[in-house]
Amino acid sequence: MAISVRIHSLLPNGSQRVEVGGRLDTHTYGELDDRLTLVLAAKVQSLVLDLAQLDYVSSAGVRSIFRARKLLAARGGTLVLANTQPQVQKVFDIVKAVPLSEIFRSVEEADAYLDRIQKKILANDED
């Protein structure tokens, strides 16, 4: 099975949503890497990976997501996961590659979290 990657429009607040579906494994991680490289080249401050349609993730897929998270964190950004399927969630639980506080049941929950983070940062800057 192939991977599908759908990139949504960049929001004015610098948040980007990317839907990932299918299988993320040794045969498909390169495509996700390529697409995320394009996304991260923009002025993205927060990235929501919507994994509702992701059926399988291998260690290569975990590395791909971790790489994007690391690149974004290096410039003060945040990567969160939303809508993880139980079998995919189990992989992240086992490898502990993504803190549980950065995995959400829905895109709306992830967006609310990112809004809180940004408001908190702005509030601290004003003090």
What is each residue range found by the language model?
Residues 21, 107-108:
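Residues at the C-termini of beta-strands that transition into short coil/loop
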Residues 2-6, 10-13, 37-39, 44-46, ...:
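Proteins with a high burden of low-complexity, intrinsically disordered sequence enriched in S/T/G/P/A and R
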Residues 12-13, 52, 84, 108:
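Conserved catalytic submotifs in the C-terminal HATPase_c
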Residues 102-106:
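Short acidic-hydrophobic, aromatic-tinged amphipathic segments that line or gate anion-handling sites
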Residues 26-101:
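Amphipathic alpha-helical interaction surfaces in cytosolic regulatory modules
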Residues 108-127:
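A charged, well-structured terminal subsegment
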Residues 2-34:
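STAS-typified acidic loop motif
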